[in-house]
Amino acid sequence: MASPSRQAPLGGSGLLHGSRARSYGSLVQSACSPVRERRLEHQLAPGDTLAGLALKYGVTMEQIKRANRLYTNDSIFLKKTLHIPILTEPRDLFNGLDSEEEKDGEEAVQPSKDEVRPHSAERKKRERGLGHANGEPLPTAGQEPARHDLSASDFLKKLDSQISLSKKAAAQKLKKGESGIPGEDSSLHLSSPRMQQRAVLGPVPLTQTSRTRTLRDQEDEIFKL
């Protein structure tokens, strides 16, 4: 009996049969998968180049060529628009599952209202106690403390008024000092008998000693030099 003809297995190595990669549709995890790509439409300008567009959108030149079926860099000017493939985040592929998990995590982290209320009540009691101790009236529950939000012009006007007030106060102090200091000095000087004698006799000439003469001679020599 003749042996049955053997059929070559599919995907065998040979000239006519290339090796096939087995995949399972949506389970393929590839960075260049069309499911994870979204394409932006870019209007071409006269100065646009493939390298510039790749840098601008954060993709490679080969990806732009593959998406637009370009074979050379100069063939981009044959089209008015180019499709730029941009990878989407894997979070978009889960149809909102991650967002629900994030919400659950945030609810677990945030404290409940029952836990927050006793802390706020304790703070209010402390603030009331401090206010009564300082003698300052505290605002009621319905009233909020007034906020003084000054504009730039109001702040400058307030600063100018404070400067003018300080200048007036300084001038008044100087006037009081000029009027009060001479009287005080005269009363102090005339209180002692020695000062009274000096006031009557006038300035007393200094006695010239040998020490004073030598000092004056030295000063004269210094000025001559």
Swiss-Prot record:
Transmembrane spans: none
Compositionally biased tracts (Acidic residues): 98-107
Pfam families per record: LysM
Keyword Phosphoprotein set for record: yes
Keywords: Phosphoprotein
Stretches the record annotates as Disordered: 97-153, 170-225
Biased composition (Basic and acidic residues): 112-121, 214-225
Keyword check for Phosphoprotein: yes
Boundaries of every LysM domain copy: 40-84
Entry-annotated residues carrying Phosphoserine: S23, S33, S99, S164, S179, S192, S210
UniProt cross-references to SUPFAM superfamilies, sorted A to Z: LysM domain (SSF54106)
Coiled-coil region list: none
Top-level division of the source organism's lineage: Eukaryota
Record PANTHER family: AND PUTATIVE PEPTIDOGLYCAN-BINDING DOMAIN-CONTAINING PROTEIN 1-RELATED, LYSM AND PUTATIVE PEPTIDOGLYCAN-BINDING DOMAIN-CONTAINING PROTEIN
Protein name: LysM and putative peptidoglycan-binding domain-containing protein 1
UniProt gene name: LYSMD1
